[in-house]
């Protein structure tokens, strides 16, 4: 394979800050080259240079051996380079065909030909999508395919994928990865950016690691393990990310649900969590884990079942009742449900606890600002200040704000649904430390995650769900990915009780 693109000695300075420090990066035709690193490592800036969105301070760009200068994205597109952004750039009110050929349609449009041309590109990708469908009516996975079709319509010979599977379920993610393999076999060069290192190991031919704007290493993917990728990214092994598990005994059971039923995906569930215990909910997508969390929190209506806090039954009809009972929920969709994305860090952090700052109905701003400042410092939120909008933060820092608003409100129980989805390895480590601290303070923690390493690394027990029921309960000595997957596909449910013989110190 020959080099399609060479970036040599790329530097980029923003004011006095060096975002890229003499980085070399090459991509060959017909290869998938993964680019990994923590948030702030320089990945976005480097790809901004390659896609024409960022003009480098120094360095050269060569395409097929010819030195090029990219001043605009149009320059990169003309050279055969396109980028699929994590936040898709599509017009929701236009059709699939119109989006694919946007800004390139003649004044007199032959609509039938436009749809035929769009269908031809979509057929090449192996997806049946109606060219006349409105983008806003399509599921996210199909919109992503339209974005790829748009890149191919531009005769792109190098496509940059930025976190392409971050919001996709396992099935759609597999289809997308297979599509990328197909593009590779056609000779298309691929740059693949992802925090999902298992995908990187699965699909990449080469891996480049950036840290603090510097090139750390470029390796053949077959020669580097996920453990080594993490060590190169953050300077420590993956096992160190989870911290030390509890060694002291758990407290009494402070949270219990009995015979909880809420639709087909929550069927007759009974389980408990002790003070200081982190209990995982594992299973496949669609097994009922998120629905269980929402039913407990009062976000979805329950058909039957009882909830107990400290041995006393509590009535939870809506999230307000849950908060009063000392239960907090960090939702799966942090941008859509966890934060007000356009509001400030201050507003988001205090929205669940305004009463503590307004005893007479008037908010004490000085007290509020001091509280928020201390909170974001404790959570290590990296920001321009408490009045910065949440949307200006990285995914990991947004998630810390979501967790932060529940830290004081969720005095008894905190439920975390996919708390590290879409965040980098360094931010994951900090979120894990927060979760451990919540447990060490005596809260009952219920952790939902599709990341099996996360479940096994953090949890004291894992309840495995499948088709709305608890299928198995795994203790640390039983933590095994094959066992978890087998249990999630099992037919017979179990009724779990807290295993009093299982204790860190016992």
Curated annotation (Swiss-Prot):
Under the heading InterPro entries, the entry gives:
AAA+_ATPase, ABC_carbohydrate_import_ATPase, ABC_transporter-like_ATP-bd, ABC_transporter-like_CS, P-loop_NTPase
Please state what class of enzyme this protein is. translocase
ABC transporter domain ranges (all copies) = 5-237, 249-492
Subunit structure comment from the entry: The complex is composed of an ATP-binding protein (RbsA), two transmembrane proteins (RbsC) and a solute-binding protein (RbsB).
Report the SUPFAM superfamilies cross-referenced here: P-loop containing nucleoside triphosphate hydrolases (SSF52540)
State where the protein is found: Cell inner membrane
- In the UniProt record, does the keyword Zinc occur? no
Instruction: Give the encoding gene's name.
Output: rbsA
Role played:
Part of the ABC transporter complex RbsABC involved in ribose import. Responsible for energy coupling to the transport system.
Protein known as: Ribose import ATP-binding protein RbsA
- The reply to whether Cell cycle figures as a keyword in the UniProt entry is no
Tell me its family: Belongs to the ABC transporter superfamily. Ribose importer (TC 3.A.1.2.1) family.
- Which GO CC terms are listed, alphabetically? plasma membrane
Matching Pfam families:
ABC_tran
**Catalytic reaction equation(s):** D-ribose(out) + ATP + H2O = D-ribose(in) + ADP + phosphate + H(+)
What are the alphabetically sorted keywords of the record?
Answer: ATP-binding, Cell inner membrane, Cell membrane, Membrane, Nucleotide-binding, Repeat, Sugar transport, Translocase, Transport
Q: GO molecular function: any one?
A: ABC-type D-ribose transporter activity
Residues engaged in binding ATP? 37-44
Q: Which Gene3D superfamilies match?
A: P-loop containing nucleotide triphosphate hydrolases
EC number(s) from the headed UniProt entry? 7.5.2.7
Q: How does it sit in the membrane?
A: Peripheral membrane protein
């Amino acid at each position: 394979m020959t080099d399609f693109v060479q970036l040599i000695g790329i530097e980029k300075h923003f004011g006095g800050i060096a975002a890229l420090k003499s980085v070399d990066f090459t991509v060959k035709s017909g290869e998938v080259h993964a680019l990994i690193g923590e948030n702030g490592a320089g990945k976005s800036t480097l790809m901004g240079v390659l896609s024409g969105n960022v003009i480098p301070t120094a360095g050269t760009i060569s395409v097929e051996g010819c030195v090029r200068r990219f001043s605009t994205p149009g320059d990169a597109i003309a050279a055969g380079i396109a980028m699929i952004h994590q936040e898709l750039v599509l017009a929701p009110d236009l059709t699939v065909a119109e989006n694919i050929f946007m800004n390139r349609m003649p004044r007199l449009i032959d609509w039938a030909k436009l749809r035929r041309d769009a269908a031809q590109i979509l057929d090449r990708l192996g997806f049946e999508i109606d060219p006349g469908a409105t983008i806003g009516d399509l599921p996210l996975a199909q919109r992503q395919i339209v974005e790829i079709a748009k890149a191919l319509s531009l005769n792109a010979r190098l496509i940059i994928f930025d976190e392409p599977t971050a919001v996709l379920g396992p099935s759609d993610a597999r289809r997308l990865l297979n599509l990328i393999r197909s593009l590779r076999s056609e000779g298309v060069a691929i740059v693949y950016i992802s925090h999902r290192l298992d995908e990187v190991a699965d699909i990449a031919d080469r891996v480049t690691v950036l840290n603090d704007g510097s090139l750390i290493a470029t390796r053949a993917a077959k020669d580097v393990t996920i453990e080594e990728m993490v060590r190169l990214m953050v300077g420590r092994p993956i096992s160190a990310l989870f911290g030390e598990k509890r060694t002291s005994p758990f407290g009494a059971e402070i949270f219990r649900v009995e015979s909880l039923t809420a639709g087909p995906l929550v069927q007759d569930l009974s389980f408990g969590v002790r003070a200081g215990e982190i209990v995982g909910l594992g299973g496949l997508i669609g097994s009922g884990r998120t629905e269980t969390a929402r039913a407990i929190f009062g976000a979805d209506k329950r058909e039957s079942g009882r909830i107990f806090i400290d041995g006393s039954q509590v009535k939870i009809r809506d999230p307000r009742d849950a908060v009063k009972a000392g239960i907090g929920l960090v939702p799966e969709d942090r941008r859509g449900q966890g934060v007000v994305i356009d509001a400030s860090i201050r507003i988001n952090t205090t929205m669940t606890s305004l009463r503590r700052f307004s005893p007479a109905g008037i908010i004490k701003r000085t007290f509020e600002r001091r509280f928020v400042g201390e909170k974001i410092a404790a959570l290590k939120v990296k920001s321009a200040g408490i009045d910065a909008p949440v949307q200006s933060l990285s995914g990991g820092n947004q998630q810390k704000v979501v967790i932060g608003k529940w830290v004081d409100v969720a005095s008894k129980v905190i439920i975390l649904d996919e708390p590290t989805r879409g965040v980098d390895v360094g931010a994951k480590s900090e979120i894990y430390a927060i979760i451990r601290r919540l447990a060490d303070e005596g809260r009952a923690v219920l952790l939902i995650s599709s990341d099996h390493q996360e479940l096994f690394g953090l949890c004291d027990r894992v309840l495995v769900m499948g088709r709305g029921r608890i299928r198995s309960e795994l203790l640390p000595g039983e933590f095994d990915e094959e066992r978890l997957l087998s249990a999630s596909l099992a037919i017979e449910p179990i009724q779990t009780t807290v295993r009093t013989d299982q204790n860190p110190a016992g």
